[in-house]
Amino acid sequence: MRKLGETEPELKSTVVAVFIASEENSSISGIGVDAVAKDGLLNELKHGPLFWIDTADKQPCIGTGGMIPWKLHVTGKLFHSGLPHKAINPLELAMEALKEIQLRFYKDFPPHPKEQVYGFATPSTMKPTQWSYPGGGINQIPAECRISGDVRLTPFYNITDVIKTLQEYVDDINTNIEKLDTRGPVSKYVLPDEHLRGGITISFDEAHSGVACDLDSRGFHVLCKATKEVVGHVKPYSITGSLPLIRQLQDEGYDVQTVGYGLMATYHAKNEYCLLSDMCQGYQVFASIICQLED
């Protein structure tokens, strides 16, 4: 942008740079690129490609995953671990319920044929990432626990459909909790004499949809050509990592293409870094793109 400002070339197209504030913000609404888009300040960019510079490895990233954060809260009955037949062990219930949910998820949302076209490294996944319980003695079966995790969803499935389906899984498991696998001869999730049943509830935090870039657009073609010229090869890829906001921009009519010049191997590392040589190539790629858009 500095070079363009200094030389002031006569261009057929307008080059606009947006420096994003709080790109991964989730706690403060109304700032950053979402607010800029809402106020219509990006509307002119609908007439040309929009390049989102936030991926890595100098290659076009043509697909990203949606994300559904979930929490599974499990209730049982607290009791001494020496008398497990008088308890409902929420840890065992959580493990078996989650296993059942995962089995159903992978049956209902299998690898999609378009994932091969886009080169996704993984299909959609549903897995735990955190486990917590209130605490207590080692000889105490707790009354409750919670498992948290996420769904990473390729953009060929609908976020709303998945949330609805996960809730249906949980409702069905609760209704038929006696049919769930147990852990050993005295493990159980119902205490008929006490009229007690274990139970699970699922809740969701804010979900985001994934993106499949338009592979027929001019923006994609000029990016690929520029990458091949500068880097020496072009190999688009897709991951189920999530990029915020770009699906919203795509739905509003923008030709969103994503690329980046950091290193995927250092994503979220303690000492995350990039290479100046890669950034220089990024400069050359976009100089080539600007030239191509003049044709």
What is the predicted function of each stretch?
Residues 60-62, 69-295:
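Metal-dependent amide/peptide-bond hydrolase catalytic core
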Residues 1-65, 294:
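Acidic/histidine-rich catalytic neighborhood of metal-dependent amide-processing enzymes
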